Each structure stands twice: as structure tokens, then as C-alpha cells.
Amino acid sequence: MEIVPTRAGYDRWAEFYDEVDNPLVLLEERHIGPLAGDVTGLAVADIGCGTGRHALQWAAAGARVTAVDFSEAMLQRARAKTGARAITFVRHDLAKKLPLKSAAFDRVFCCLVLDHIAELDSFFRELRRLCRPKGHVIISVMHPAMSLKGVQARFIEPASGRRISPASHAHQMSDYLMAAVRAELLLEHVGEYAADATLAARSPRAGKYLGWPMLLLLKLVPRG
């Protein structure tokens, strides 16, 4: 497997990202909606929006969406989709301070991104900064247990047949929880979700992970 810089990896993945059999994405989409709740009329930030799969859904539901990603190729795919004109897209490196106003969002989402973030403390502080006092920060990430299976974000490049992995970081669950604590974010919900028969019926790749935790979800609220 070829490990490449994270941005370069997602630039290469963008063209076919939405077409790949990705059981983690399917599992996440099953659970993130109920956790998000009704977003009608809310200001929503999608940090690490990729090809816009969530941003478009929330915009269609009536949210005012700002979507941020560092991959121009991913953003190009997102902007080309139906409904994208209603979304404000921002290209920005997530390792740096986000160019968004403080306390401007009712929901701050960060979906399947954290394993590519080296410095969690400063990143969690940024997520909290964006969130309104009575808002929520909602995070999804590949469950750390997947590392025991030797799994990390990866794809097979159709043109070359090579297995490519954008560079990632092996964080533990405690790393995420303690980063939230240090950012003064309170844990309202934590969910661990495993592959099941329903997922395997939709995604052949999920079959080898039946019963194994694949997804971690956190719902956080600013302290005080």
C-alpha cells in the first residue's frame, strides 16, 4: 500500500469517492441523521465536507450551510452537485485556524476527518469556538478498534490498480474524549456502531467486519 500526503490522497480519490463501496460511510449515514436532529433554519458548519454528501443533505433540509475542506478536487465535486448553490464552500487547511466567525453555528459537524488531524487539542478548540452556546458539535470517526484490523482510510486507484492510503494518525478513543474535555466540550452522547447483516447486504466489504466496532459518534455541547 502506498501512503501519500493526506491532501494529495483525497485529490486523487475525489473523482470516484462517491462511487466506491465504503461500508463506513454507509454505516455513518444510518446514524448521523438522528443524532443531528432537525436542522431546518439552523446555521450549520460542515468541517471536512469532502464531496458534500452531508452538506447537500442539510441544505436541502433548510439549513444555512458553510462547508470547509482542504481538497480542491473534493470541493469541485461538491460544487457540481444539484443544490450546491445554496452552500457556502470554503477551501482551507483544517490544521490551521478556521476562517469562520466565533459562535456562529448551531451545529458544527466533523465527519470522518479526525484520523487525519495530528493535533487534536487545537482542532477541538476550533470546533468549540465556532459553536453557539446552546449548539452542538457532532463528530464521526472511524472507530479506533479498526486499527486492530489493520484498517485505515484507503482506496484502489482505478487507473493504476494501486492501493492508496492518505496519511492518517492512530488516535485512541481516550484521545478524542480528552481533547473534548480540554476544549470545554461536554459529552452528551457517545455511540459505538458495529457492522451488521443489514450493512453487509448493502456493502460486500462490510462482511468481514461483522460485529466489530467500525464507527464512533460523539455529540458534544459547549460548557457553560
Task: Identify the residue ranges that each predicted region occupies.
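Conserved class I S-adenosyl-L-methionine
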Residues: 1-39, 53, 57, 74-77, 136-163, 167, ...
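A short acidic, Gly/Pro-enriched loop at the edge of an enzyme's catalytic core
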Residues: 98-107
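A short SAM/SAH-binding and catalytic strip from SAM-dependent methyltransferases
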Residues: 107-119
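Class I SAM-dependent methyltransferase SAM/SAH-binding core
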Residues: 45-96
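Conserved Class I S-adenosyl-L-methionine
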Residues: 186-224
